[in-house]
UniProtKB/Swiss-Prot annotation:
Protein name (Swiss-Prot/TrEMBL): Protein Ku
Molecular function terms from GO: double-stranded DNA binding
Pfam families documented for this protein: Ku (PF02735)
Keywords: DNA end degradation evasion by virus, DNA-binding, Host-virus interaction, Inhibition of host innate immune response by virus, Viral genome circularization, Viral immunoevasion, Virus entry into host cell
Amino acid sequence: MRSVGNVDLTIGLVTVPVKMVGVSESHDRKASMYHPHEDGNFGKIKMPKLCEDCGEVVPTADIAKGFEEGGDIVILTADELASIAAATGAALEVPQFVKAEQINPMLFANENIYRLVPDPKRGRQAATTYLMVRHILVSQELVGVVQYTRWGRNRLGVLDVEPSDDGGVLVIRNMMWADELRSTEGIVPTNVTEDDIDPRLLPVMASVVESMTGDWDPTAYTDRYTEQLSEAITAKAQGDEIATVASESGKAIDDVSDLLAKLEASIQKKAPAKKATARRKKTA
């Protein structure tokens, strides 16, 4: 496991030395930009760091971090930025415990999650304290509110327990700050209410949902885009031609009868067939 840093988890006067490790790795196929040459070679495109004022390419060593303030540019040195981070504290400080359901789940929309691993260099006490914190969170059904500074930003998160075969792993789930979550004003229609829903539709919709309800199995879902992208890359590398397919947009629902028919048809169609990869062999 690759650690992103060693840090102290502090709860009151209790300190648990831990390592923060990422929980995921991307399986996306990332494209790079190339310049095709007539001789069949490809030159990788590199982005120069251009100064928009003088137009010159600027070496990384000559680049400073600045912030706009009242129409001016304020430059902060690396030492100044480091001192700000140090002043706000790098420890995972837990000032409060709350019930998980009290937190708006939308605050986790852009979350990063880090697992906390007891630092093996700090002995048995670190490990037993780790287990004690885990026990309290699980037994009292609480999460800890966490505030810490990392990578040049003060961050808010929750200390939670990820279920696992060995009793659970402590995790930090980053949250947005309250003022970073956009308002819901203007999203929900105000020209109609639930009283305007046709009474024939609700029981049929409920049946559709019931027919699609089951136990959660994350392995049942795969990244179809990445799978087909990989197949297309392999096919083209072998000389096959990739057929282009126009995207399909859903047909508009004209009236209640049309919607009712679609809902009833949905009950009969519980498991849609997997689409075949859109490609064909290159013809001579």
